Structure formats: structure tokens, C-alpha cells
């Protein structure tokens, strides 16, 4: 089993637990569900059980264009209907995902990266301004994940760029999930 399968498995566990957690707002659960779908397909791909790179890429793209903005909404507008009602969270995810698909079809490849980066940067700024240490560490972890992956950083032959993405996303989403759960309680 290669390192990508292991790190994607960790991301799958974290995102799946958030997605099924009844104490989380719908917006973070939908975002986590999209990330979990990509991670599940990544595990299947990287273990060789079901190598479907296009499906993994598709759901990763949905994560970038729909899940990251939805995650930002969870914290930027935590009291809104968009963050707290399934109907509006779902509509937002579908529209954001559709925009991502259109951008992909038009070969506007930077769209997904730009949306993810802007969403995560907004999370970082909001967390710093509100002096929320847990959310800040989580948001900075997500920012680290996006930046290291975009820069194609690897560590010798041990960790590939995707490994850093998976590890820092798992850490960031876990911490942000914990923060969202604490706020809801």
C-alpha cells in the first residue's frame, strides 16, 4: 500500500465522522461528505482496488469548488440559514459545484485552486480576527494543505504532494469540525 492510500484513508475517516455527526451544522456535514467521497475514491484508486483517477479528480474538484466555500460559510456566517438548514446548504453546494464544472468544461483550470485558496484565506482571517485559536490552527492547516499541494512539495520518496494535502486537510478539518461542534453545543 502506498503513502497516498494511507493518508487518504486518514482523511476519509476524519471527513466521514464529521459528515455523519448529528451535532454538526448541515453546511460542514455536506462539505465533509464531498471531501469524504473524494477520499474514498482516492483510497480505492491508490490501493489499486478500483483505479478510477477521473472519478477521484472529479470529486476532488467538487471539494475545491463547493466544499471549501461551504466550509467557509459555516464559520463566516455561522448563524445564517445557509450554514444551518439542509435545503440552503444543499442548494449552495449544487450551484457552487455546477460553477466548478462549467469552469472545468471551459478549461479555466485555475478556478478550483482560486476558490479553495480564497475560501481558506477567508477562514484564516476570520479565525484570527475572532481570536479563535482552535479555528485558526485548523484554517492554517487547510491553507498549508492547499499551498503545499499547489507548489508540488514532496519529501524525498516518503511523502508525495498529495500526502501533504491529505494530512493537513485531515488535521484542519478535524480541528474545524471540533470547533463547529463546540459552537453548536
Question: In which residue ranges do the predicted regions lie?
Answer:
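Membrane-proximal helix-loop-helix units in multi-pass membrane proteins
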Residues: 57-126
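Aromatic-anchored segments of alpha-helical transmembrane domains
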Residues: 36-44, 93-105, 140-153
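Membrane-interface helix caps and helix-loop-helix hairpins in membrane proteins
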Residues: 50-54, 101-112, 153-160
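Membrane-interfacial loop-to-transmembrane alpha-helix junctions, especially the N-terminal start
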Residues: 24-35, 81-92, 130-141, 185
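Hydrophobic cores of alpha-helical transmembrane segments in multi-pass inner/ER membrane proteins
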Residues: 8-20, 64-79, 118-125, 166-183
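C-terminal transmembrane-bundle signature of multipass membrane proteins
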Residues: 129-185
Amino acid at each position: 500500500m502506498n503513502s497516498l492510500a494511507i493518508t487518504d484513508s486518514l482523511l476519509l475517516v476524519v471527513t466521514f465522522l464529521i459528515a455523519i455527526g448529528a451535532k454538526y451544522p448541515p453546511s460542514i456535514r455536506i462539505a465533509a461528505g464531498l471531501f469524504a467521497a473524494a477520499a474514498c475514491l482516492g483510497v480505492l484508486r491508490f490501493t489499486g482496488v478500483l483505479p478510477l483517477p477521473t472519478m477521484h479528480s472529479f470529486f476532488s474538484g467538487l471539494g475545491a469548488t463547493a466544499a471549501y466555500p461551504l466550509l467557509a460559510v459555516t464559520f463566516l456566517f455561522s448563524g445564517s440559514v445557509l450554514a444551518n438548514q439542509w435545503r440552503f446548504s444543499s442548494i449552495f453546494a449544487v450551484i457552487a459545484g455546477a460553477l466548478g464544472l462549467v469552469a472545468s468544461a471551459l478549461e479555466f483550470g485555475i478556478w478550483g485552486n482560486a476558490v479553495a485558496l480564497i475560501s481558506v484565506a477567508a477562514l484564516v482571517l476570520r479565525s484570527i480576527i475572532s481570536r479563535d485559536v482552535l479555528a485558526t490552527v485548523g484554517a492554517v492547516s487547510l491553507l498549508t494543505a492547499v499551498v503545499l499541494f499547489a507548489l508540488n512539495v514532496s519529501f524525498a520518496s516518503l511523502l508525495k504532494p498529495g500526502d501533504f494535502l491529505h494530512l493537513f486537510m485531515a488535521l484542519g478539518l478535524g480541528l474545524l469540525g471540533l470547533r463547529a461542534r463546540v459552537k453548536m453545543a
